[in-house]
Design a protein with these regions (language model features):
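C-terminal output helix
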Residues: 115-124
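Short, conserved "switch-loop" micro-motifs in signal-transduction and mechanochemical regulators
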Residues: 79, 93-94
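Two-component/phosphorelay signaling modules centered on CheY-like receiver
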Residues: 19-38
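Receiver (REC) domain active-site loop signature in two-component systems and cognate sites
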Residues: 64
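Acidic, metal-coordinating helix/loop segments flanking the phosphotransfer/catalytic sites
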Residues: 39-57
C-alpha cells in the first residue's frame, strides 16, 4: 500500500446491523481527517458496496443477520481487489478463541464492545498509516 500525500482521501466501509452502533462509529471516525465513511447494514450489503467501490479499510461487526462478519472477512480475503484491505472487527464476542478465529481468517484488529472512540480512531489511523 503506497504512502499518500497529506490531503489524500481515505475511504472506510462500516458494516454493522445496529443503527445506533453504526451512528456511533460514524461519529467517532468523523474525527479522522480525510476519511470518507460508507455504511452497510449486514455482510451481504457490505459485499454489494465492495463490488461497486474500493475501500481503504473495513470496520465490521461479527454478529449480523444474513451474513456475519467472519464470513465477510473470508469473502474479502478471497477477493483479488480487496484481499489486502485492512479489516477491523468490532464485537461483543470477547473470548480468546473468538479473537484468534477472526485473526486467523484475516482480520487485522479486534475490538470488543462497548467500544471507546479513541481506541477505534487509533486503530483505524494505525492501519491506514495516517497521523
Amino acid at each position: 500500500r503506497p504512502q499518500r500525500v497529506n490531503m489524500a482521501e481515505y475511504s472506510c466501509l462500516i458494516v454493522e446491523d445496529s443503527p445506533m452502533m453504526r451512528q456511533l462509529l460514524v461519529f467517532a471516525l468523523a474525527r479522522v481527517k480525510n476519511l470518507r465513511v460508507t455504511e452497510a447494514d449486514d455482510g451481504v450489503d457490505g459485499l454489494r458496496k465492495l463490488a461497486s467501490a474500493r475501500f481503504d479499510i473495513i470496520v465490521t461487526d461479527i454478529n449480523m443477520p444474513i451474513m456475519d462478519g467472519l464470513k465477510l472477512v473470508k469473502r474479502v480475503r478471497g477477493d483479488p481487489v480487496h484481499k489486502d484491505t485492512p479489516i477491523v472487527i468490532i464485537t461483543t464476542e470477547g473470548s480468546h478463541e473468538d479473537r484468534q478465529r477472526a485473526l486467523q481468517l484475516g482480520a487485522n484488529a479486534y475490538i470488543t464492545k462497548p467500544i471507546q472512540a479513541p481506541q477505534v480512531i487509533a486503530t483505524v489511523k494505525e492501519l491506514l498509516k495516517i497521523e
